């Protein structure tokens, strides 16, 4: 019985990904370079993409965030997501 309990504990620890962190695109332009992902800090649970218009055209910022950012004064669109490379 003790062996079974120990086995279950070990399997549970192995199956849990206790150190998982998000990976998001990080860039401040219209497009990101392929494969350019950043490992977010442990408290950052969201990837975001915000776009807004300025004199030179539409700008896009992508990154990691602890909470979903609200649109700025100039913000047209904010996308928040919780899976790797979703922004």
Swiss-Prot record:
Tissue specificity statement from the Swiss-Prot or TrEMBL entry: Expressed by the venom gland.
PROSITE patterns for the chain: SNAKE_TOXIN
Keyword Signal: yes
UniProt entry tagged with the keyword Nucleotide-binding: no
Role: Binds and inhibits muscular and neuronal nicotinic acetylcholine receptors (nAChR). Is a reversible antagonist of muscle nAChR (alpha-1-beta-1-delta-epsilon/CHRNA1-CHRNB1-CHRND-CHRNE) (IC(50)=10 nM) and a potent and poorly reversible antagonist of the neuronal alpha-7/CHRNA7 nAChR (IC(50)=50 nM). May exhibit differential affinities for the two binding sites on the muscle nAChR.
Family in the record: Belongs to the three-finger toxin family. Ancestral subfamily. Orphan group IV sub-subfamily.
Protein name (record): Candoxin
Taxonomic source organism: Bungarus candidus
